[in-house]
């Protein structure tokens, strides 16, 4: 094989780790994937073993090399993208985590989030971080670990512990402890970072009593953070030079560089992000304001709507209810359903995300009759994903006073043609599916490649763009609104059921 150069992207997700090697055309040369254990210590809690995540990353790096025959010295740079908010605290000396990683989905810190709300901090946190106070973000997770591991607070104050989201943990491991860094997009999801002033917020750190010594340095999304320790990369000292949280990486991978462009990634959850340009814009309707990416000395902001359960609702049909053998089968069943659409599934298994932010809500089903079939139930579950996306797109249009013309989509569930057509119908706009669904990994690769000159600039990246399939709306207006009205009723009833008893 010639000494062609490549970029490797490490995509560390919620249920698996992947390594993908890309060539100059942005094409996938090889990939490797490994699932790891989901730990559920109590109802609503979700944890990961951070060492197992690291082992899975080492495994997929090897797998990507083996599959392609590419050698480590042919990798020009590494880009990292990761499940956001998931929190690791580890011992600086030994490199060992002091507790499991608390995952973004986990609700174990919900009481702490409620406490902060009741103390009147909602507005302050929103103005500084762009976020809603919720157990979803890293801040309460860090506080929980420092509270529940004996001696942790004292050790943190002495500078013996380090905190990081998964990007930080992986860079620290790959560089053998030489770099303790994060990037704008991941820092913006901690609820500890002031996205206006671009620094860790001293006042919030004080409120939560989190020592500054444990925090990583915040850097741009495209620069060299460090090099791989040779023994972690088969003898290669390769620059790690691009980093972004998974949803922001997908925004970049979808080449959504212009303000007003919107993408949705249908993964475990579903995340809709709109590029709002260089002006920070706070949502008045419960969307998150976050950092899209920072590159070439400029920071681009974004509005985001987070849906906690999307693809994982299909996994639930497969693993929990055993209604389907595999995820793609859900499309076949949905097409076989009676065409009445009167069943509504509200998959609030871990609460409701944007724009409701109800952490007490739980999953519910409405409209069942004696005639309801398995096919109807599966279809309603798929439709629930599309309804939740509409909740957010409608809110975004109100917040920005922008009419969204097209939604760029990617992620595993975007392969479901039934879901994509229903999404176009219920939104009444075109859905443009990326030809290369690896947009998250591709975004990380683009960020890494730009900083080492593998790709010259954003204009060169735009030339690599190939659109996949376009789904156009075909449902009439009154039917569309009637269906959506039913969904709103179902969500309202779900929230009533979740009300805390006196």
Curated annotation (Swiss-Prot):
Molecular function as annotated in GO: ATP binding; glycerol kinase activity
Binding partners and assembly: Homotetramer and homodimer (in equilibrium).
The protein's Enzyme Commission number: 2.7.1.30
Keyword Nucleotide-binding: yes
Binding site for ADP: 14, 18, 268, 311, 412, 416
Post-translational modification (record): The phosphoenolpyruvate-dependent sugar phosphotransferase system (PTS), including enzyme I, and histidine-containing protein (HPr) are required for the phosphorylation, which leads to the activation of the enzyme.
Key words, A-Z: ATP-binding, Glycerol metabolism, Kinase, Nucleotide-binding, Phosphoprotein, Transferase
Regulation acting on activity, per entry: Activated by phosphorylation and inhibited by fructose 1,6-bisphosphate (FBP).
Upper taxonomic lineage: Bacteria, Bacillati, Bacillota, Bacilli, Lactobacillales
Species of origin: Streptococcus pneumoniae serotype 4 (strain ATCC BAA-334 / TIGR4)
Alphabetized InterPro entries for the sequence: ATPase_NBD (IPR043129), Carb_kinase_FGGY (IPR000577), Carb_kinase_FGGY_CS (IPR018483), FGGY_C (IPR018485), FGGY_N (IPR018484), Glycerol_kin (IPR005999)
Biological processes, Gene Ontology terms: glycerol catabolic process; glycerol metabolic process; glycerol-3-phosphate metabolic process
Source organism superkingdom: Bacteria
Pathway field: Polyol metabolism; glycerol degradation via glycerol kinase pathway; sn-glycerol 3-phosphate from glycerol: step 1/1
Gene: glpK
Protein's name according to its UniProt entry: Glycerol kinase
């Amino acid at each position: 094989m010639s000494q062609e150069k490549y970029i490797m992207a490490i995509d560390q997700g919620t249920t698996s780790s992947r390594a993908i090697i890309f060539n100059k055309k942005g094409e996938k040369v090889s990939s490797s994937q490994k699932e790891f254990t989901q730990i559920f210590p109590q109802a609503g809690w979700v944890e990961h073993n951070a060492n197992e995540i690291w082992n899975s990353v080492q495994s997929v790096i090897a797998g990507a090399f083996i599959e392609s025959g590419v050698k480590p010295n042919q990798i020009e740079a590494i880009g990292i993208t990761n499940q956001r908010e998931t929190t690791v605290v580890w011992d600086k000396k030994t490199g060992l985590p002091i507790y499991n990683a608390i995952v973004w989905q986990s609700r174990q810190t919900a009481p702490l989030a409620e406490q902060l709300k009741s103390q009147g901090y909602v507005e302050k946190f929103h103005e500084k971080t762009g976020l809603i106070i919720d157990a979803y973000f890293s801040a309460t997770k860090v506080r929980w670990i420092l509270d529940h591991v004996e001696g942790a607070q004292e050790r943190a104050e002495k500078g013996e512990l380090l905190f990081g989201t998964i990007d930080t943990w992986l860079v620290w491991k790959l560089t053998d402890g030489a770099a303790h860094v994060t990037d704008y997009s991941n820092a913006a999801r901690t609820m500890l970072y002031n996205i206006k002033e671009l620094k860790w917020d001293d006042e919030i750190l004080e409120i939560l009593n989190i020592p500054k010594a444990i925090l990583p340095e915040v850097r741009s999304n495209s620069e060299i953070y460090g090099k791989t320790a040779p023994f972690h990369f088969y003898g290669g000292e390769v620059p790690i030079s691009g980093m972004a949280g998974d949803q922001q990486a997908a925004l970049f991978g979808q080449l959504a560089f212009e303000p007003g462009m919107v993408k949705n990634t249908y993964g475990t959850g579903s995340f809709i992000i709109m590029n709002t340009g260089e002006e920070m814009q706070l949502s008045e309707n419960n969307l998150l304001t976050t950092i899209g990416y920072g590159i070439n000395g400029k920071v681009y902001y974004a509005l985001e709507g987070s849906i906690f359960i999307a693809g994982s609702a299909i996994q639930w049909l497969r693993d929990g209810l055993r209604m389907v053998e595999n995820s793609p089968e859900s499309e076949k069943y949905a097409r076989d359903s009676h065409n009445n659409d009167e069943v509504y599934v509200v998959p609030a298994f871990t609460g409701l995300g944007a724009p409701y932010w109800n952490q007490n809500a739980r999953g519910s089903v409405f409209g069942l009759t004696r005639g309801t079939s398995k096919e109807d139930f599966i279809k309603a579950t798929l439709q629930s994903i599309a309804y939740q996306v509409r909740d957010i797109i409608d809110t975004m249009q109100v917040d920005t006073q922008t009419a969204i013309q097209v939604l760029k989509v990617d992620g595993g569930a975007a392969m479901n043609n039934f879901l994509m057509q229903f999404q176009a119908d219920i939104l009444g706009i075109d859905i443009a599916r990326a030809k290369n669904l690896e947009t998250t990994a591709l975004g990380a690769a683009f960020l890494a490649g730009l900083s080492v000159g593998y790709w010259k600039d954003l204009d060169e990246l735009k030339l690599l763009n190939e659109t996949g399939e376009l789904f156009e709306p075909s449902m009439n207006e009154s039917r569309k609104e009637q269906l959506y009205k039913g969904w709103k009723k179902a969500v309202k009833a779900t929230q009533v059921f979740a009300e805390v008893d006196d």
